[in-house]
Amino acid sequence: FQSFYRNYTDGGERDYICVYRVNRDASVTEMTFVYDDSRIQMIFNTAKYENRDWKFIATGIRDLKDMKLTEKGYFIYTYSNIIAHGGLKEYFRVSPLTDECRKLTRKYVYGLSYVNYNMLVIDWDESNASDILVPCMFDDIYRLYTGENLKPDGGWIDADKYESVMLSMFPVTVTELRDNCDYNSEKNSYRYQVILGKQYPPFGEVVDYIYNDDGTVSLIVDAVWADKGSDIAFRNTLTVKPEEDGTFKYMSNHIEKMECDIPVYSD
């Protein structure tokens, strides 16, 4: 991949590289990226193995506006004509994360949002953790805590369930939760707030980690924002405290601007 990209950036001779992608529906897409001195194209063929035979589902050619191979190993490319509801850019990772970074990403970071609440976009610690509390974050936190999707009861979440999860996951108090997360004393419940999805937001991945003497782990998290063409839009130091029973608590966050402006959360 590096030699193909180097040939492209140096204006070298015609070159191509073939990539195979396994899709969620068990189909396989062959993508051939072709460069010559006048244009870049991607030729694709998608097929699925059924009844002991391969059946072609789709085939075509797309012109590309540009492509980029980052130092960390992301291949990011832009179509010349963006289809309706499509992303500005497409991407995949050429150089994989280490097994430990992938494990830490899945356990502590996967599913957290940079745009739906401010947990990852402001600095906070035990002294001001209540600043990150908003009702809509519970969906994601519950999923990380239980491994299951939340099923609210008639638009409300029982206080015992809500507080058990949030007190386990953050250094906050019941009073702070009830003051900030739409608690209803008559129902002894918290109102369920649906997150309005935002297209193609950045996502975080753990690229390094430090095991601290106090038992906490400081995760170095880079934000990948493909639509901005960046695999290090900003960098977080997210500190967590693992417990012996397998649960954990988020203890603090520090964010640093790198290649892109940090999103500003507004409810």
For each predicted feature, which ranges?
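Mature, Sec-exported extracytoplasmic domains of Gram-positive
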Residues: F1-D267
